[in-house]
Amino acid sequence: MPASFSIAGRLVDLHARAIRPATVHVQDGVIARIEPAETVPERHLLPGFIDAHVHVESAMLPPSEFARAAVRHGTVGTVSDPHEIANVLGVEGVEYMIADGRPVPFHFAFGAPSCVPATPFETSGAELGPDAVSALLDRDDVPYLSEMMDYPGAIDGAPNVLAKIRAAQVRDKPVDGHAPGLRGDDVAQYAAAGIETDHECVSIEEAREKLEAGMKIAIREGSAAKNFDELIPLMDEAPDRLMFCSDDRHPDALAEGHIDTLVRRALNRGYDRFDVLRAACVHPVEHYGLDVGLLREGDPADFIVVDDLDALNVQETYVEGALVAEEGETHIEHVASDVVNRFDAEPVAPADFRVPAGGDRLRVITAVDNQLGTGEEVVTTPTDDGYAVADPDRDVLKLAVVNRYTEESTPAVAFVRGFGLDGGALASSVAHDSHNVVAVGARDDALARAVNAVVRAEGGISAAAEGTQVLPLPIAGLMSDEPYDVVARRYTRLTDYVRAELGSAMDAPFMTLSFLSLLVIPQLKLSDRGLFDGAAFEFVDRFVD
């Protein structure tokens, strides 16, 4: 039943850009009236935070469980792109996310995925063409077109790309962008195609060009891509066109903080408090037309209580008048989610990862901790008995992708630097964006054990050293069906195991691994079909002439 109550404090009015003592009266989950007050407790009332672009699945939690974790940090809603599960299950996956999140006191805004699969150079579990996208956009609970990753298609006027953009425009729904590194005239053409936002900027110069082209920028700080430090000076340049987002946030990170962390960091650097809070609370609501309250009379009673605007400790979170979190504890009950999946891969053998030596010079992916992009190096090929092999002493490891959507497939194998493994292997069925099984390892037998642990669990993340540990992800091979705190603890233990037993010093090894198959972000990536140059947008050989 919607709540009715009154609460007093120092109200942070983000529209008037003022702070005043007030009593807020909530009636049936709606803010009935706001009255001036002379004496109020030393606490602040302000609108709740919105994550302006996030893949809920990356937290390895279904929406209902994601909400339980996020409200603890003052988040009351998300702009969520469900293209992870859509790549596995198609429209059924999108409908699953909407249905799982609907009963929870939280505002999920799921978009229509625009690029499923992300490219034609990989195998996914589904394909969403213009008709399927249009049908999703017909729904009132699908308020926008998710990130258009096919920026070459948008720039070149590819009919299927423009059809999806047009489907959103005729329904007066926003179109999200995704254009890492796009500069110059291409930016103007991309924006002219109808793209309104971007969250992929890694340099402030890139962001300025996109702002100049008329786009809005979501400043991203997730578990893999961390762009806050580079982009936050934009708060002094274009505060009215900024939002905050996490994009991809793993369960351990979500347990520790969310958008509140970015707000706190921005405020501590001295940026205007109203500019910062409007970016975190108001701009996503206005841009996407979300039915989320902004602490005004007649709004849904969505707001948070914090101790002060410096420490910004979230004491209480309210959604439609319901107290959903208090002093770091969620009040949303855990409800078991349905399990849906598609996982057809069979176990592999160590011999499946053999690579005949095809030359003296080897093309190697260079992975970068806390970034989605990669580099490329050419090294002398390490060999043994006629095969190209991993060389942990030089941090040259094998990288493999196994097609999860067929029973019979040969792993695609390449080589990578950056993980620093002394031995063993790790594997994951979270492998953007088609979510095959991606693995990195120092030995073929360890690669086989890590991959097979994921295969037998029908989805998960694993690490193989002397033993093998696995975190099962039975929901589409992406999400757990356990409570968020259990998932966070198990994920942390597995990451610690990778550092202690496999020797990696990476901050987020599983997140970094999961993006090595994302072909739409350059430079060098690996799909289940081979080594791919994301800048040239073509397959390349493992060996260099």
From Swiss-Prot:
What is the official name of this protein in its record?
A: Adenine deaminase
Q: Which UniProt keywords apply?
A: Hydrolase, Manganese
Classify the source by domain of life. Answer: Bacteria
Cofactor requirements of the protein: Mn(2+)
Q: Which residues form the signal peptide?
A: none
The record's top EC class is hydrolase
Enzyme Commission designation: 3.5.4.2
| UniProt xrefs under InterPro entries | Adenine_deam (IPR006679), Adenine_deam_C (IPR026912), Amidohydro-rel (IPR006680), Metal-dep_hydrolase_composite (IPR011059), Metal_Hydrolase (IPR032466)
Among its keywords, does the record have Aminoacyl-tRNA synthetase?
Answer: no
A GO BP entry is:
adenine catabolic process
Q: List the catalysed reactions.
A: adenine + H2O + H(+) = hypoxanthine + NH4(+)
Lineage of source species: Bacteria, Pseudomonadati, Rhodothermota, Rhodothermia, Rhodothermales
MF annotations from Gene Ontology: adenine deaminase activity
- Write down the species: Salinibacter ruber (strain DSM 13855 / M31)
**Which family is annotated?**
Belongs to the metallo-dependent hydrolases superfamily. Adenine deaminase family.
